[in-house]
Amino acid sequence: MGQQFSWEEAEENGAVGAADAAQLQEWYKKFLEECPSGTLFMHEFKRFFKVPDNEEATQYVEAMFRAFDTNGDNTIDFLEYVAALNLVLRGTLEHKLKWTFKIYDKDRNGCIDRQELLDIVESIYKLKKACSVEVEAEQQGKLLTPEEVVDRIFLLVDENGDGQLSLNEFVEGARRDKWVMKMLQMDLNPSSWISQQRRKSAMF
């Protein structure tokens, strides 16, 4: 990217929402202070959001990075960054679910298979355990295993029984069933995670 942020370009790419021009210019200034090249690589993304250097956090954040990286070039530019923030922080429930779907859809083929779902559920379980979340529930034997969560989600959401979750099945299944909504977001949904990490970061 160049050293000037274009308000018109941001509008064309859907990066603007409730943020005004002055706020976006300030974000861009701070973004370039942290990333002079104008793009974030994976290691910079982790530093940007103050991600702990452990396996549990890394797995989840790498999935988050892929969702930010809309063009698949393994970097995040400012427009991708702001567009994602506006979507997950200010978007509708449907928008947030669609974005969460992108995190699960590791190979970007438009469907989520059992292994993709299991990988994310396992990484979030590990991250929550590392943060001592729901330890008491697990000790009491009330917490489902990742495999049990995946089996139940597919039973409730995979309407055509093809072993994959389409975007429509994912969104409608979450809307239809509160348990599915909770499990797909795992109480660690992208919106709340990003909000927490942004508060930890001095960037915004």
Curated annotation (Swiss-Prot):
Binding site for Ca(2+) 1: D69, N71, D73, T75, E80
Impact noted for substituting Y104C: Partial loss of activity but no loss of calcium sensitivity
Residues with a covalently attached lipid (N-myristoyl glycine): G2
Single GO biological process annotation from the record: visual perception
Record domain EF-hand: where: 19-54, 56-91, 92-127, 145-180
Membrane-related topology note: Lipid-anchor
InterPro entries: EF-hand-dom_pair, EF_Hand_1_Ca_BS, EF_hand_dom, Recoverin
Source taxon at top rank: Eukaryota
Keywords: Calcium, Cell membrane, Cell projection, Lipoprotein, Membrane, Metal-binding, Myristate, Repeat, Sensory transduction, Vision
Binding residues annotated for Ca(2+) 3, in chain numbering: D158, N160, D162, Q164, E169
Post-translational modification: The N-terminus is blocked.
Gene3D superfamilies xref list: EF-hand (1.10.238.10)
PROSITE patterns from the UniProt entry: EF_HAND_1, EF_HAND_2
A Pfam family that the UniProt record links to this protein: EF-hand_7
One GO cellular component term: cone photoreceptor outer segment
UniProt: Ca(2+) 2 binding residues: D105, D107, N109, C111, E116
Record's subcellular location: Cell membrane; Photoreceptor inner segment; Cell projection, Cilium, Photoreceptor outer segment
GO molecular function ontology, one term from the record: calcium ion binding
Entry comment describing in which tissues the protein is expressed: In the retina, expressed in rod and cone photoreceptor cells. Appears to be more abundant in rods.
Stated role: Stimulates two retinal guanylyl cyclases (GCs) GUCY2D and GUCY2F when free calcium ions concentration is low, and inhibits GUCY2D and GUCY2F when free calcium ions concentration is elevated. This Ca(2+)-sensitive regulation of GCs is a key event in recovery of the dark state of rod photoreceptors following light exposure. May be involved in cone photoreceptor response and recovery of response in bright light.
Protein name: Guanylyl cyclase-activating protein 2
